[in-house]
Amino acid sequence: MNTRVLRLTTTRPPAIERRVVQTSMLSLVLLVAAWCSISIGAAKSDLLFPIKLIGEWIASGQNQSSIMMIVSEIRLPRVILAILIGAALAVSGASLQGVCRNPLADPGLLGISSGAAVGAVTVIIFANSLSVPQFIQPYLIPIAAFVGAAITTFTIYRLAQVNGTVQIATLLLAGVAINAMGGAIIGAFSYVADDQSLRLMTFWMMGSLASATWFMVAISAPVLILGMYFIHKKRTEINLLLLGEANARYVGVDVDRVKHHLLWLNAIVVGVAVACSGIIGFIGLVVPHILRVST
């Protein structure tokens, strides 16, 4: 009996080539979005602003016109910080989905963002009664948000430990409980806040990059970049955790140590991101799924 083997050919490029093409396209989209964000605004809209800005820097070494000051001192820090925070939240969401083996896991689900919000709202409510040095006051809310995220992560981690092992189900339940508790605390603060504090609370919790400065970029960029780098170094362990903790241990992964490191790396990254921009949801949940579908 003769059997025929049909070989199906496809024009689909190899995986590496396809990934290069997709990365190039996404980078181009990011570049176009950043270019438009720098060029378009309430003061004046001109798609040639970045070119003019570079030309003026080269010619005089400083920004002469007011519109150039707006571009270089307001729009550019916001764009850079938006890119860093978006990337950090996406990387954090992808790693938490791997650690928890839950496609719906994100920093908000585990209560990290809620803890940061409680810290920031606490400072907003009691700002008038706090005596702090003048130079720290502009950064008091970001510092409180980061501390709140760190305390929340420590609490969730301790609650999730059973006999020295972090249980994923307990971790998720503790995160949901802390998230609900944080919402209740914020609601109570909203009830006792005056009009000015209530407006500031609402504005901060909506998420905004209006307070972005070069100083904030200089402080947050190294932390976010290093945090994303160390999370990316754990990509092999995260992929193995997706197969199950037993299988990961079978191939030599120290599961408890990896989960410990990833939880604290995510706490640092998300804490800094939320401290700079307020609560920005949806990115950490959806972006990893979009990239998985596209690749």
List each language-model region with its residue ranges.
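Alpha-helical transmembrane segments in inner-membrane proteins
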Residues: 2-295
